[in-house]
Each structure stands twice: as structure tokens, then as C-alpha cells.
Amino acid sequence: MKQYIVLACMCLVAAAMPTSLQQSSSSCTEEENKHHMGIDVIIKVTKQDQTPTNDKICQSVTEVTETEDDEVSEEVVKGDPTTYYTIVGAGLNMNFGFTKCPKISSISESSDGNTVNTRLSSVSPGQGKDSPAITREEALAMIKDCEMSIDIRCSEEEKDSDIKTHPVLGSNISHKKVSYKDIIGSTIVDTKCVKNLEFSVRIGDMCEESSELEVKDGFKYVDGSASEGATDDTSLIDSTKLKACV
């Protein structure tokens, strides 16, 4: 169940999101009981009408991995590392956190007026990115434990876009109907600049269809109201307009 709290100009959303993915590649492993797991996150943000026009996408991308250390008596218990990706562009500062999830290898953006589209995804085997195969048991554990957070704030960054010249790479997932599962831990949205937010997340095997290894979820925040209805991620954004940020 998703919950949200509006505080001043901030909307805090505790969301749950599942995701499903699948893809094929000549470099997929042929080993039995091995799977190339991936994640695909699609975000559509509609900015407030009064937000100053800024179409400079991909101004900067940073990646930071943090591990929480909890001291218990004389022992130090290390928590699972969380990797944060911060994307600045088009008047927004978007921070995504991933814990025990498939690796993000592709980040892209597009902007059209007050609409900003962003995509973060794994990259399927055979496209020059590392995509290690894991066992079925490890894949099921990843689906169960993967947790994601989103924090979208306003940005006044004025630097030029840093768009890469290579094509946007992706996970080549199936986007078929699959079961839902909680993946999103929390979402923070600064309503000073964000009017609406829609996003979809999928996790699954990138090389073969397997309903047991694919999950998805979606979330909407529209005109001040949060909705648990998952967005149809196949039509959420026009992927052909995305430009590579990394």
C-alpha cells in the first residue's frame, strides 16, 4: 500500500513497486540455471507551469555507493550497500537509490516543454556492458530484496547539457503482463516545481521470459493525489526521443 504526506511544498510518498524485464542477446549464457537479471525504470515528470523553462537535459550524472555501519556493542554490522544516481537536467535534480537491485548501466533523458522523461536501466548482454549471470535462487532473492527510492527536487543549474554521442542502450525487456511486487521504498517530490509524476519499474530476466522471475509496479502522483494504479510503461514515454546521459 502506498502512502504520502504533504509537508509544505514537499510530498513524501512511501511506495511499493514491482517490475518485470526480459531480453535476448547472442551473448546470453547457455548455462543451465543461470540468469541475466536487469531493471528498467521509466519516469515522466510534468513540471509546474510557473517553472522557468529549462530544456538542458543531462547536465550532470553522479554515482555514489554508500554502506551503513551500525555499531552494536563492540561489533560493527555492515548494512547492504546502496548506490545512488543523481541526474541534474531540465530544471530538476533527481536522485535514485538502489539496494540489492540489478546494476544500472544506462541513463537517458528527454525534455519537451514542461515534460521531462528519464530512464535508468540495465543493459542486456552483447552491448558492451557487464551483465553477469546469477543462479535462479539468487535471481529470486534479488526480486524479493531489491529496494528503490526516488527524490526529485528543483534545480537551478545553468551548465550546458552533456549528452553522449552513442545510442541509448537498454535492457530489451518484454513489457508483458506480470505480477506486482513492492520495490519502491520511498519517493520524495518537491511540488514547487513538480506538478505530476508517473513512473514504472520492472525487474526480471533479460534473456528469457520467465513469469517467476519478472515483476513490475507503477505509481502516479497527479494534481496532488497519489494513485496505486500502475502506469502502462510501454506508452509512458517516447523512448525514441531519449538522449544518452552516460
UniProtKB/Swiss-Prot annotation:
It comes from Monkeypox virus. This is Chemokine-binding protein. The gene is OPG001. Its main location: secreted. Inhibits host immune defense by binding to host chemokines. Binds host CC chemokines (beta chemokines) such as RANTES with high affinity, but not CXC or C chemokines (alpha and gamma chemokines). InterPro entries: Chemkine-bd_vir, Orthopox_35kDa, Pox_vCCI-like_sf. Belongs to the orthopoxvirus OPG001 family. GO terms for cellular component: extracellular region. Residues 108-132 are annotated as: Disordered. Induction: Expressed in the early phase of the viral replicative cycle.
